[in-house]
């Protein structure tokens, strides 16, 4: 059995797609980001923006990685080499990876639209930190960013759950008990 084939079988047998080692940290960070929206302090809102950005980027990377494994598992025993540099990718590149490798079509276009809007808003706010003369206006921009981030996160969480549902269905069809 080839190494790549073994990796796919182990990924399925060990149900690695269902593991989320970052879940408790992600929940904690999302709570902090949500709290920052209610804080009138601009520094707190900027901190919330940074947290939202990292949480959403990491969630998207995890979804892309899981999607790649799903593609490999779905065509198994045929193998394909799909290697992406998720660690070194910019957020825009990770969005492109999602566009290319999304395995669930439901809400795909809405998620892509939301991610692009989120990235554009982030760039706008970050690059305009010095140009927005009124700090109150900056607070409004940061609150708009936070609202968009929250909506984006909800879509990503739902999408991730649908990918996991697809893995459950694939497990049932393959009959993994013969590999255990």
Q: Where are the regions that the model predicts?
A:
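N-terminal hydrophobic targeting segments
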Residues: 1-16, 137-140, 144-147, 151
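A general boundary/transition motif marking the beginning of the first structured unit of a protein
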Residues: 44, 48, 82, 86, ...
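Short coil/turn segments at secondary-structure junctions
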Residues: 36, 40-43, 106, 140-143, ...
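Amphipathic alpha-helical interface elements
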Residues: 2-93, 109-120, 127, 163-179
């Amino acid at each position: 059995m080839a190494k790549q084939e073994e990796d796919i079988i182990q990924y399925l047998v060990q149900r690695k797609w269902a593991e989320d080692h970052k879940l408790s940290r992600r929940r904690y960070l999302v709570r902090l980001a949500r709290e920052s929206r209610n804080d009138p302090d601009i520094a707190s809102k900027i901190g919330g923006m940074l947290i939202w950005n990292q949480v959403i980027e990491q969630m998207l990377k995890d979804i892309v990685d899981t999607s790649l494994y799903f593609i490999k598992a779905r065509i198994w025993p045929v193998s394909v080499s799909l290697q992406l540099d998720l660690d070194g990718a910019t957020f825009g590149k990770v969005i492109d990876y999602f566009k290319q490798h999304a395995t669930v079509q439901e809400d795909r276009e809405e998620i892509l639209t939301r991610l692009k809007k989120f990235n554009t808003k982030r760039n706008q706010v970050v690059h305009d930190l010095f140009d927005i003369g009124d700090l109150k206006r900056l607070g409004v921009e940061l609150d708009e960013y936070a609202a968009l981030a929250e909506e984006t996160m909800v879509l990503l969480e739902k999408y991730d759950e649908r990918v996991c549902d697809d893995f459950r269905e694939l497990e049932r069809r393959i009959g993994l008990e013969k590999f255990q």
